[in-house]
Each structure stands twice: as C-alpha cells, then as structure tokens.
C-alpha cells in the first residue's frame, strides 16, 4: 500500500506563465487600465498610421497591402520592433515615446497606431504581457489597435488597447474604410441629390404653370 501526501502544489512550465499573466491581469484591472470608458475612439478616416511590428515577415506586408488597397490616401509609417525577447517591450515603449513626439516634414504624426505580430508560443508573446508596456499604452493619447498573434491568442495588450483585432490583416481592415464602399455611397448621394433637384424643379414648374393659368383666368374674366 502506497500513500502520497502533498503539502504544496506549484505551477510549472506553461501553467506558471498562465498564472503570472492572470495575476498581472487582476492587478492591472484593479488599477482601471482595462475599463471600457477609458477607451479612445478610432479616427474614421486616419491620415497616417504608425505600425509597430517586425520589419520582416508577412505581417507588415499584409498590413501595408490591405491599407493601401482599401484607403490609399492614408500614410503608413513602419516602426520596426523586436516582437519577442526579454527586452522587446522596452523597445516598444521607446518607440511609443518617439511617436507621440513625432515631427517630420515627410510624414504626418500618426493619428492611429497598430501593434502587430504573427502567431507564437506563450513565451514568445510575453513582451505584450509586460506591466510596464501595458501602463505606457494606457497613457497613450493616440488611439490604437492590438493585433497580436492569431484569433485565439490573447495578451494583456489586447485588454488595454482601444480595440482588439483578431489578426493583423483584420486590424488593417478595421483601421481604414473601403474606398469602393465610399465611392458607392457618394454615387448614391449624387443620384438622390439629382432626383431631389429634379423634383424641386418639377414642383416649381407646376407652381408657375398654375400661377400662369390663374392669371389667364382672371384676365379673361375681366
């Protein structure tokens, strides 16, 4: 007969990381960093977008292609970051300081920021769970979208950002309107405007005709 007595159970591996993230989430939530009423509204027609992501890989190409295809008048500025590693969150914070004080004759200061990276392991996504980064993003005056990993991946950055996108490509689609949709809207408005003008013209024409008939009637009566 064997007897197993357990005095203490500790998380290890992935379990310990998940517990760390959950503890941080609770602590930051109590500070109000994830409150919905603190979220900033995204610009409807952004003039310039700053994208914080790796300078290599498919993510940045997908974002640039999608934004340029949907709304080509928007400027795109890529701020290349290390999307994983022990100090990558510090690098991101430094770039955020740079963006908020951005001054260039060639590029407008971003009025929208996208954080993006492709999928990865829990360990690889940890920079986006660092409290210092979360607190810095909370203080950002520029509206921002989080697009980290795949649809099933969640980081603390997703909770503090003004909006979470399930994928980087989805972030690009959320960030800007579709020019074809806008053109169709303009064409519809043009048709309605022309119809309204035509109806007004016909109404005035009918009014003048009635007035003319009334004048003729009184003239004949006299």
Residue ranges and their predicted role:
Residues 116-117, 121-180:
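Small-residue-rich beta-alpha loop regions that form the catalytic core of phosphotransfer
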Residues 151-222:
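Charged, elongated alpha-helical interaction scaffolds
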Residues 20-124, 129-132, 138-140:
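Phosphate-binding glycine-rich loops and their immediate beta-loop-alpha structural context
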Residues 2-19:
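OB-fold/S1-family single-stranded nucleic acid-binding modules
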Residues 11-15, 48-54, 79-86, 123-124, ...:
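Flexible, glycine/proline-enriched loop segments at strand-loop-helix junctions
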Residues 6-8, 67, 160:
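A short beta-strand motif that forms part of the nucleic acid-binding face
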Residues 5, 50, 114, 145-147:
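Structured core elements
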